[in-house]
């Protein structure tokens, strides 16, 4: 798995604000990008951004609210629609194979 460096200026320019504003607030431990942005096929007009997040406290009350709020704020910060998944949401083996082939680490705390 490669770390994102020149992946997408949109992401690279916002990594530090993302870490400061969102990661600590929502208990995010790890954030990866996959799909068109990770493959270099990102279309600035039509593409959304696909992420896999690992957050603390998945069994704690309020986790679903934190997850949804994180997704909303991530979209606002990036100015694009986002699809946010966790590892446990990726159950289809064909989808898993595609995700695993393209995923790139953005942040790990």
Predicted regions and their residues:
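Short, aliphatic-rich beta-strand segments
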Residues: 50-53
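Catalytic core of pol beta-like nucleotidyltransferases
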Residues: 1-32, 38-45, 56-109
